[in-house]
């Protein structure tokens, strides 16, 4: 299964959970301390990254999604660092700062790629007022399509049942990364994502895949869950849904370097994909691919849409599929830096026909990469009138992304793609029809940047309008 990446700019996700700051100190070690039998590390580099629920938010932002995070912090320097880092990534931070607690901070000391020690600075948040988070959730829920509850057992989800019910009352699915063996706390969740050890802590030792499936379905019934995704390390993932066959996904990790934050990546990509319109099985396939990427990195890491597309398609030289504007700009820069000629075209492509395919094949032959910009449903309706489009934006983009000639598919909501083309600046802009180059939207900007504009002929006898009329007349 090779799913097409959705447009993550449509994904609004609310994250509620245990936020923390991950700090890393790096340096060489070449001697043992005379004070105790421990290595001496000469710290030469340091780094700070959002961790826990904050890493989930960072993952969603790196995909181009809209992340809104609610969590508990102290009134201290780590809280300011955490908020500043997330805000710089366009994450909306809504922290509850409590004066009697420190912001959870984890300091890791590494040498030659190996973690030597971790130091935790934390006190569990206890007896907090649920309304502090519930009131913030109430304001955020109308703006999102998914909720993630990220539980590290640090106290932010002390009132987790109230949070689940608040989201369900708003009609928003709730995805939970659980902690501990008390799954009763998560009753009614749309999806739980335990790893294998967390799963076995609840159901007992699992000796076979069949036993995993049986015990998993029993958990779904017992705790009134919508679905269960068990992450199984080198054995991949298993998705269990009410009334459906088990869905097994093999691991995509080529090399495991560090599993820190892998669970955060799984739930963030899964929830963002569902929020962007993907079915649960496709979202799990994307999350599985993302996990394979992130375990190959050191420390708490994120996955970009470029990396995710490469993981899904198996190579940096294969089609990337549907992509957000920000990710496309990044991808085009990389392609042009490699000396590749990027070609761009645009259209509604409402009912894809032989004329479209011929045109796109011709366009692809003019360069190394082909971008197709697609009018959104609202844009098509303004241009073509009531009753159009026949196919939704997601379906039109999915079909285009499946063509061998097409590398990237990106949506735009305006009447013309002029702004988008000016942001992308392809090497060659092509358009079908009888236009003059200077009349083509975005043409002036491309030429001013040193690019070219070319008009291609459409194949005669192929027209979306004619196809629609033929179907209406019963000639289809």
UniProtKB/Swiss-Prot annotation:
GO cellular component terms attached to this protein's record: cytosol
First-level EC class: transferase
One Pfam family here: PfkB
Reactions mediated catalytically: D-glycero-beta-D-manno-heptose 7-phosphate + ATP = D-glycero-beta-D-manno-heptose 1,7-bisphosphate + ADP + H(+); D-glycero-beta-D-manno-heptose 1-phosphate + ATP + H(+) = ADP-D-glycero-beta-D-manno-heptose + diphosphate
An MF annotation (GO) of this entry: phosphotransferase activity, alcohol group as acceptor
Biological or metabolic pathway of the protein: Nucleotide-sugar biosynthesis; ADP-L-glycero-beta-D-manno-heptose biosynthesis; ADP-L-glycero-beta-D-manno-heptose from D-glycero-beta-D-manno-heptose 7-phosphate: step 1/4; Nucleotide-sugar biosynthesis; ADP-L-glycero-beta-D-manno-heptose biosynthesis; ADP-L-glycero-beta-D-manno-heptose from D-glycero-beta-D-manno-heptose 7-phosphate: step 3/4
Region (Ribokinase): 1-318
Residues annotated as binding ATP: 195-198
UniProt-listed GO biological process terms: ADP-L-glycero-beta-D-manno-heptose biosynthetic process
Protein EC: 2.7.1.167, 2.7.7.70
UniProt keywords, alphabetically: ATP-binding, Carbohydrate metabolism, Kinase, Multifunctional enzyme, Nucleotide-binding, Nucleotidyltransferase, Transferase
Active site: 264
Task performed by this protein: Catalyzes the ADP transfer from ATP to D-glycero-beta-D-manno-heptose 1-phosphate, yielding ADP-D-glycero-beta-D-manno-heptose.
Family (UniProt): In the N-terminal section; belongs to the carbohydrate kinase PfkB family. In the C-terminal section; belongs to the cytidylyltransferase family.
Annotated NCBIfam families: cyt_tran_rel, PRK11316.1, rfaE_dom_I, rfaE_dom_II
Assembly behavior: Homodimer.
UniProt name for this protein: Bifunctional protein HldE
The organism of origin for this protein: Vibrio cholerae serotype O1 (strain ATCC 39541 / Classical Ogawa 395 / O395)
């Amino acid at each position: 299964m090779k799913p097409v990446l959705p447009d993550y700019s449509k994904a609004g996700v609310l994250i509620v959970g245990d936020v923390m700051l991950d700090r890393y100190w790096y340096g060489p070690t070449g001697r043992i301390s005379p004070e105790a039998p421990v290595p001496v590390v000469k710290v030469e580099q340091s780094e700070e990254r959002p961790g826990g629920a904050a890493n989930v938010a960072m993952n969603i932002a790196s995909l181009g999604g809209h992340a809104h995070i609610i969590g508990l912090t102290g009134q201290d320097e780590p809280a300011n660092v955490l908020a500043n880092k997330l805000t710089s990534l366009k994450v909306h931070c809504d922290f509850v700062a409590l004066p009697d607690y420190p912001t959870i901070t984890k300091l890791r000391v590494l040498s030659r790629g190996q973690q030597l020690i971790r130091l935790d600075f934390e006190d569990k948040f206890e007896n907090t007022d649920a309304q502090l988070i519930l009131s913030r959730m109430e304001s955020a829920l109308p703006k999102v399509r998914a909720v993630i509850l990220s539980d590290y057992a640090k106290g932010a989800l002390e009132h987790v049942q109230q949070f689940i019910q608040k989201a369900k009352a708003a009609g928003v699915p709730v995805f939970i990364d659980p902690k501990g063996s008390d799954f009763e706390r998560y009753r009614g969740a749309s999806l739980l994502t335990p790893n294998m050890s967390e799963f076995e802590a609840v159901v007992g030792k699992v000796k076979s895949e069949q036993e995993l499936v049986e015990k998993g379905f029993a958990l779904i019934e017992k705790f009134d869950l919508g679905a269960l995704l068990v992450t199984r390390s080198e054995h991949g993932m298993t998705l269990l849904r009410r009334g459906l066959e088990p869905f097994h996904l093999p691991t995509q990790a080529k090399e495991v370097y560090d599993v820190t934050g892998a669970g955060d990546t799984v739930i963030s990509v899964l929830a963002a994909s569902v929020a962007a319109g993907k079915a649960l099985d496709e979202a799990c396939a994307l999350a599985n691919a993302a996990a394979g990427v992130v375990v190959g990195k050191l420390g708490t890491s994120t996955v970009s849409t470029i990396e995710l597309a490469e993981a899904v398609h198996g190579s940096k030289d294969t089609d990337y599929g549907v992509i957000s504007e920000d990710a496309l700009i990044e991808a085009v820069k990389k392609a042009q830096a490699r000396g590749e000629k990027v070609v761009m075209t645009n259209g509604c492509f409402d009912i894809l026909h032989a004329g479209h395919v011929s045109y796109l094949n011709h366009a692809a032959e003019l360069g190394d990469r082909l971008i197709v910009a697609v009018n959104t449903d609202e844009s098509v309706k303004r241009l073509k009138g009531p009753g159009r489009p026949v196919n939704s934006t997601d379906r039109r983009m999915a079909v285009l992304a499946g063509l061998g000639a097409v590398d990237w598919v990106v949506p735009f909501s305006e009447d013309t793609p002029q702004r988008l083309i000016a942001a992308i600046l392809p090497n060659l802009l092509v358009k079908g029809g009888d236009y003059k180059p200077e009349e083509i939207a975005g043409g002036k900007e491309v030429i001013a940047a040193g690019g070219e504009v070319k008009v291609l002929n459409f194949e005669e006898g192929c027209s979306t309008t004619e196809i629609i009329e033929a179907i209406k007349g019963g000639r289809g």
